[in-house]
């Protein structure tokens, strides 16, 4: 083979290479486009597949939880569970919130009992103090 023939063949190969590369690139981008359209179709056909609670709902829940407003936190947690029934964190928080509410209720009942006992002892103490105060007033007048 002569040098001219070899050079001519290389030029032919070089001419075809860019086209081949462009074809391969367009094929790969076409494949990518098809993949995304398939994913879009899957998402459209099953809209409840990955339903998430709104971010605002989540932040309000965290604010209520951190602010120890357990009644509000319980309601917000229930709403999150409506959106995401299988959310493990929401399930765990829900049971913990219920425990906290029971503890608060028990504590409030104890405080109410303590206050009622204090009220009873104060009213008994006042009734014994009243006659002595009146007698001291009478002494001053005399």
From Swiss-Prot:
Location of the region described as Disordered in the Swiss-Prot/TrEMBL record: 1-55, 104-142
Domain of life: Eukaryota
Biased amino acid composition, Acidic residues: 28-43, 109-142
Biased composition (Basic and acidic residues): 9-27, 44-53
Protein name (record): Glutamate-rich protein 2
Protein source organism: Bos taurus (Bovine)
């Amino acid at each position: 083979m002569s040098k001219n023939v070899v050079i001519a063949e290389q030029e032919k190969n070089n001419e075809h290479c860019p086209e081949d590369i462009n074809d391969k690139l367009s094929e790969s981008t076409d494949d990518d486009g098809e993949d995304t359209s398939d994913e879009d179709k899957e998402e459209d056909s099953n809209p409840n597949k990955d339903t998430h609670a709104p971010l605002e709902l989540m932040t309000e829940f965290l604010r209520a939880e951190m602010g120890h407003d357990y009644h509000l936190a319980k309601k917000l947690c229930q709403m999150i569970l409506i959106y995401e029934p299988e959310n493990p964190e929401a399930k765990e928080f829900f049971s913990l919130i219920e425990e906290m509410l029971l503890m608060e209720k028990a504590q409030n009942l104890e405080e109410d009992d303590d206050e009622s006992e204090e009220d009873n002892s104060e009213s008994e103490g006042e009734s014994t103090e009243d006659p002595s105060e009146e007698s001291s007033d009478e002494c001053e007048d005399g």
